[in-house]
């Protein structure tokens, strides 16, 4: 059977799906991503945001992806990464936050609330309940990290080196974090504004061409609050893993189901 032509509405929807680009720097990437969002994003109203049940207007692009290649030396320029963060958060301490957070994530200690939130308290304080967060990346990464790195060391061709962040499956209390005082729950039970759930789905690490690549998959990302931070931290994780394995870095690959910005934040920047 011949392929039927999409409806006008369907064709318009297809236009929102972007072709993946390859960038030579984080700064080049963050500017182009911003332009794509402002010029090609569509207005979408959502009914909850993390642990808030309320209506919010956003601008969104879907199924968005890109890659960034490292330098010829096989590493990403930290100065370039920092400039990317400063581009979205000028005159702030967000780079300092990133530096503290990657230490929490790679400390091999299960930390909640950890240390980094103190640097960016204006964002994170509202999510603290009885002195803890609903989850931390440290809690979710730490029990997996060394096992994944050893697998990459012993089986260079593996496609199974995935560090899961988001989890819809059930675990007994404490089994995810390794801490019996931390009650684990289904992320599925937290949806709809009940509690925070991770925007990140997983990191996939792959050894190819004598270098370590990282594929970062997210369900959702807020450009004006978290995007450059998430990219900085993922690349820093790639550098950490490459260093542990004695490898150079290969390309960094990114995909998100929804890249968006909230009307309230865009108005503050004079955009919406």
Regions found by a protein language model. Name each.
Residues 2-272:
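Terminal, non-catalytic protein-protein interaction segments that mediate quaternary/complex assembly
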